[in-house]
From Swiss-Prot:
One of its GO terms (biological process) is DNA-templated transcription. It comes from Pseudoalteromonas atlantica (strain T6c / ATCC BAA-1087). The keyword Acyltransferase does not apply. It catalyses: RNA(n) + a ribonucleoside 5'-triphosphate = RNA(n+1) + diphosphate. It holds the Pfam family RNA_pol_Rpb6. InterPro entries: DNA-dir_RNA_pol_omega, Pol_omega/Rpo6/RPB6, RPB6/omega-like_sf. Belongs to the RNA polymerase subunit omega family. It is an enzyme of class 2 (transferase). This is DNA-directed RNA polymerase subunit omega.
Length: 90
């Protein structure tokens, strides 16, 4: 895999501080939440994969926010359906 430099990823995000926040958030999604990577993973750790995704333009703060909203909406919808089913049974 090609090496990822912070400078390449900073250009996509704007500054180092926001880069750290976005990369950490995406790395958590990959490592803990089991999200699918937009680049080949190989033997790279989630932080490196997150930086590569940012560098290639697949991940930004706004895409993470939009994905989070979609996930939250799906979770809310499932909870509403569960409550509706319980109420119908009564």
């Amino acid at each position: 895999m090609a090496r990822v430099t912070v400078e390449d990823a900073v250009d996509k995000i704007g500054n180092r501080f926001d880069l750290v926040l976005v990369a950490a958030r995406r790395a958590r999604q990959l490592a803990i939440e089991g999200k699918v990577a937009h680049v080949s993973v190989g033997t790279d750790k989630p932080t490196v994969v997150a930086l590569r995704e940012i560098e290639e333009g697949h991940v930004t703060a706004s895409t993470l926010d939009a994905e989070n909203l979609r996930d939250q909406h799906a979770q809310d919808q499932a909870q509403f359906e569960s409550v509706a089913n319980i109420l119908q049974e009564q």
